[in-house]
């Protein structure tokens, strides 16, 4: 369904799709091909040309207009295909690995444009294996493994559900071994790292039943100077790996 209606041929003008495998005609010129693809989406020639010049100016690629596609690098061609995907202001956008082939600068440029389209009301389906992109762009996720859906929901809710009440703490101490033993007598310490140069003891500490973050912080403050204290929240990559292992 699109807008509550079964998909019909006229709905194509409301959908933008950027496939992982790009499909530009290599012998055509950039401007010629962009105009052709825009008109396939229902745009008039004049409106397509106006919007194309807007996007080409925005991306500073106006000098590509008369180049042939086979003269462009993979990243350059991908930027053209992104433009023609969003040109007709679709309600639904489907991006399949949109950052493939981009250097970090252009990847950030496209990421910012995707976020802007989201903020302007477009619905975006984003397919990727890059979990850092999921963190940056997605509100809701579906994890698929071996063609089966294994997890679905709001990303923030899922991250809260997967957290383990573990805190990373940094302490200033000249007696790291003694302090570590003192903490271990009351809390579960999973990892420890001591830097003698600045007397910095870093610990990952998990809370037990009926123990609170305030209990831990008060205990640590009584023992040493606390340099930092933060809860460890699993990222999308951690959740993906753990979910696959559990399944």
Model-derived regions, located:
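C-terminal coupling/interaction segments
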Residues: 207-247
């Amino acid at each position: 369904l699109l807008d509550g209606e079964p998909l019909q041929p006229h709905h194509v003008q409301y959908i933008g799709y950027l496939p992982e495998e790009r499909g530009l005609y290599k012998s055509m010129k950039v401007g010629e091909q962009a105009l052709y693809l825009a008109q396939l989406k229902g745009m008039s020639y004049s409106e397509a040309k106006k919007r194309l010049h807007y996007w080409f100016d925005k991306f500073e690629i106006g000098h590509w207009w008369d180049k042939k596609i086979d003269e462009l690098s993979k990243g350059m061609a991908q930027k053209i295909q992104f433009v023609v995907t969003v040109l007709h202001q679709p309600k639904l956008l489907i991006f399949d690995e949109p950052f493939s082939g981009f250097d970090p600068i252009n990847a950030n440029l496209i990421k910012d444009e995707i976020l802007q389209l989201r903020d302007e009301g477009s619905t975006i389906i984003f397919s990727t294996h890059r979990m850092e992109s999921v963190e940056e762009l997605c509100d809701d996720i579906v994890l698929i493994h071996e063609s089966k859906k294994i997890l679905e929901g709001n990303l923030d809710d899922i991250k809260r559900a997967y957290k383990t009440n573990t805190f990373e703490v940094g302490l200033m101490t000249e007696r790291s071994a003694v302090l570590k033993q003192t903490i271990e007598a009351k809390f579960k310490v999973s990892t420890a790292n001591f830097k003698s140069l600045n007397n910095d003891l870093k610990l990952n500490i998990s809370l037990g039943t009926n123990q609170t973050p305030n209990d831990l912080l008060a205990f640590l403050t009584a023992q040493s100077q606390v340099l930092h204290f933060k809860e460890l929240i699993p990222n999308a990559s951690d959740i993906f790996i753990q979910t696959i292992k559990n399944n």
